[in-house]
Amino acid sequence: MPTTPIPFTPLHMFRRLLCVGLFLFAGIHTTLGATLPLPSTSYKYTVLDQDLSAALQEFGNNLKISVNISAEVKGRIRGRIPELSPREFLDRLTDLYDLQWYYDGVVLYVSAAKEAQTRMLVLSSVHFSAFKLALDKLDISDERYPVRPAPGNGLVLVSGPPRFMALIEQTLNGLLAVAQAQPRATDTPARESVMVLFRGSSTTVVRGGRPEVFYTSEMLPENDDGGKAELSKK
């Protein structure tokens, strides 16, 4: 029976993104993609006539690997399969039956090639270099499924099997949430306050909380009628 997919919870994603920051700060380098733990010895598997999904499930059971097989994986294995290494055996079935597989570090996901998805993602406030680096540090990147930026770093084109695509979107959403949670510095300067205080025959202009100009009725310039001009409020 297929195993249940293990989703990343927001807390899980936050912890992994925090680890990414620590890796970047410390300058630690990791390999790309989660490594599928397969032995290098030959995998002996005798098949006469068996359902493809059952053979893949038995493959995982024999190697102590959790396997999630899509319902779209169909077919039967007939005939003898040569003695191969476990990785070669998996790749051979993938090529023969038009499949894709992806290992997320916990579960090996096998799906039909026709289930592959292609999406254009909007990076918004996240720069592509930061997005790609997060995928590498979280062991999500896979050289078989490239992530390509569009000119200007605002868009990214991603193609791959369903599990890979789900982790891509979860990572981007996590980075966007972290970016939105950070305080934003405002580029708009504070408006300067100006007050005009009238007290009897004197007038004081206060700009930015500081008295700046002091007038008396004798100091105001005369208008065209020979009277004192009035100081307008600002």
Swiss-Prot record:
Q: Which domain of life is it from?
A: Bacteria
Asked whether the UniProt record includes Cell inner membrane among its keywords, one would answer no
* Principal localisation: membrane
Q: Does the keyword Transmembrane apply?
A: yes
Gene for this chain: nolW
Question: Which cellular component appears as one GO term in the record?
Answer: membrane
Subcellular location(s): the record lists: Membrane
Task: Give the membrane topology.
Answer: Single-pass membrane protein
Q: Which UniProt keywords apply?
A: Membrane, Nodulation, Plasmid, Transmembrane, Transmembrane helix
Record InterPro entries: NolW-like, NolW-like_sf
Residue ranges of the TM segments: 17-38
Write the protein's name: Nodulation protein NolW
